[in-house]
């Protein structure tokens, strides 16, 4: 097929392929696009790839303008979870899929979408025809000609934004928007990036496992894998980013917990480079003889990174499209004439733009439009332990607590979770960290008399422990809304909030999801996960919550 006549009139040309295979067909398509002087500015390819871990995988590409999403799921499930407008479908050898996929193909088809197919059954051709596809005589080519009007594409936003917050959430937002050609102003009250919750010496990056593969597990898996790929594009761990992919060993809490983990290992067929269950002898051998009484999970590709260095790498990648307004103190936010305007305590305008992204953690509660969001500030204290006071570890070790290998003669241990608003180091929190460290190492004398040293940060946490990613809801205008898509939103106001202790992992993919959504691109996550992260979920939950006793008349 000659794609050139199809993509020359589109700003983005999206292809869905039911078989990635060895990638050769995708490379041919990309080569054709690259060499066409009349090509669309952007080529987005979505393909099924069964050998990957379950879910959606956004694969960063060196080629500007090319996006590749690989999905590990059955065809019907993948299409049902896809948020996209597809211009071309390539369906290969799907006769075993039945006919349910046809309605999902029609749902994501763009106006005048085309279809190439091999091996369709008569029932599948009939199902696609019933959904609005008109086939050629050969039964292998079709065009979407549904009489149902396609939902109008959202208007192209003006590509200027303010990002409030220069921590891990804000830096990721700036980098993902600048990568799309946006002009971004990052505003922060501190004089340097990553001076608040993102300022720890070390953050742990690792996946999450669960028996039921629940929402936090699926989100964290997708975000972890995206982060590893994206960080390589930024220069890599140990190079542009300070840290080490030394691996993480997560010990089982007790014998019962170990049995649950063995069941996960037996049922998931996880690749060893992603996660491997180690029994006690293997775990203790890895730790050089330290106790690991109930075994644990080894995440070989995981490790630690200094969040501030990740922020710096992302902000540096923005180039000349980024303006930094740091050290401005607290700001006042107003909407005026289609613009968001930030002014400092002296009434001087710091920045203005049609789009504002709140990435300032618990500080979002001070913004009137975000104040109804049920966000909580939780204090976390990390202890800095002299390296000669604890065993030298080849990996990050964690259970209820964590301990990193040494960096600069210091190991990080922690961290506490409490509601104390005091930003000063607390001897009680330090003692709590050391007590849990001794339990982790099975050594009652580890780090004995370690001096009070460390850092305090404040996490922003949502009631469901999931992040808030997307356009912020207007609680006052919500009325009797029952569906997420119908919730009224504040114009040009977005949130990247509620990262709790997983900002290092969640930030990159969350920012990519936000930027893709603003631009009207195919989304990098399943729609069920997108909905689970939508800030407007709390509007619906507030409506559905049981009311207390009503006063009698």
Identify the role of each PLM range.
Residues 2-58:
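SAM cofactor-binding core of SAM-dependent methyltransferases
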Residues 51-81:
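S-adenosyl-L-methionine
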Residues 99-111:
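A short glycine-rich, Lys/Arg-flanked "PGG" loop and its adjoining helix->strand segment in the class I
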Residues 140, 148-180, 189-190, 194-209, ...:
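Active-site substrate-recognition segment that forms the wall
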Residues 202-286:
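Dinucleotide-binding Rossmann-like beta1-alpha1 core, especially the glycine-rich loop
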Residues 211-212, 240-250, 274, 280-318, ...:
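Helix-loop-beta segment of a Rossmann-like dinucleotide-binding subdomain
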Residues 297-346, 350-355, 359-360, 364:
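Helical element adjacent to the flavin cofactor pocket in flavoenzyme catalytic cores
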Residues 449-553:
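C-terminal catalytic lobe of FAD-dependent flavoproteins
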């Amino acid at each position: 097929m000659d794609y050139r006549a199809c993509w020359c009139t589109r700003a983005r040309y999206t292809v869905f392929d039911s078989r990635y295979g060895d990638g050769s067909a995708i490379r041919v398509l990309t080569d054709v696009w690259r060499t066409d002087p009349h090509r669309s500015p952007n080529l987005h390819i979505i393909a099924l790839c069964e050998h990957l871990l379950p879910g959606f995988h956004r694969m960063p590409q060196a080629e500007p303008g090319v996006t590749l999403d690989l999905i590990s799921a059955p065809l019907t499930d993948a299409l049902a979870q896809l948020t996209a407008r597809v211009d071309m479908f390539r369906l290969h050898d799907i006769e075993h899929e039945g006919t349910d996929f046809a309605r999902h193909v029609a749902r994501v088809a763009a106006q005048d979408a085309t279809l190439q197919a091999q091996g369709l059954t008569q029932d599948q051709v009939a199902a696609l025809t019933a959904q609005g596809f008109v086939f050629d005589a050969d039964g292998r080519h079709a065009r979407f000609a549904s009489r149902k009007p396609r939902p109008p594409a959202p208007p192209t936003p003006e590509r200027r934004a303010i990002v409030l917050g220069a921590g891990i959430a804000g830096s990721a937002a700036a980098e993902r928007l600048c990568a799309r050609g946006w002009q971004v102003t990052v505003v922060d009250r501190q004089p340097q990036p990553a001076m608040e919750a993102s300022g720890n010496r070390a953050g742990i990056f690792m996946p999450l496992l669960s028996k039921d593969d629940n929402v936090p597990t699926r989100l964290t898996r997708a975000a972890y894998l995206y982060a590893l790929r994206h960080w390589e594009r930024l220069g890599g761990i140990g190079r542009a980013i300070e840290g080490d992919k030394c691996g993480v060993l997560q010990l089982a809490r007790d014998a019962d917990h170990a049995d649950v983990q063995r069941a996960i290992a037996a049922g998931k067929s996880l690749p060893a480079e992603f996660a491997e269950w180690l029994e006690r002898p293997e775990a203790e051998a890895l730790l050089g003889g330290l106790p690991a009484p109930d075994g644990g999970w080894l995440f070989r590709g995981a490790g630690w990174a200094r969040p501030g260095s990740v922020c710096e790498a992302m902000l540096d990648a923005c180039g000349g499209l980024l303006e930094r307004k740091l050290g401005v103190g607290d700001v006042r936010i107003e909407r005026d004439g289609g613009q968001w305007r930030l002014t400092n305590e002296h009434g001087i305008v710091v920045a203005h733009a049609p789009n504002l992204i709140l990435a300032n953690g618990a500080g979002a509660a001070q913004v009137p439009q975000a104040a109804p969001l049920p966000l909580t500030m939780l204090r976390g204290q990390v202890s800095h332990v002299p390296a000669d006071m604890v065993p030298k570890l080849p990996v990050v070790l964690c259970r209820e607590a964590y301990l990193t290998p040494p960096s600069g003669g210091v190991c990080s241990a922690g961290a506490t979770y409490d509601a104390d608003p005091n930003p000063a180091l607390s001897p009680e929190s330090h003692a709590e960290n050391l007590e849990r460290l001794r339990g982790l190492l099975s050594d009652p004398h580890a780090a004995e008399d370690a001096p009070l040293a460390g850092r305090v940060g404040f996490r922003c946490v949502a009631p469901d422990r999931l992040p808030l990613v997307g356009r912020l809801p207007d609680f006052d205008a919500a009325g009797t809304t029952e569906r997420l898509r119908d919730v009224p939103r504040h114009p040009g106001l977005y949130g990247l909030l509620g990262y709790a202790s997983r900002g290092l992992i969640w930030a990159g993919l969350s920012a990519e999801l936000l930027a893709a959504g603003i631009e009207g691109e195919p989304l990098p996550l399943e729609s069920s996960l997108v909905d689970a992260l939508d800030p407007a979920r709390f509007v619906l939950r507030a409506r559905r919550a049981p009311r207390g006793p009503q006063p009698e008349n």
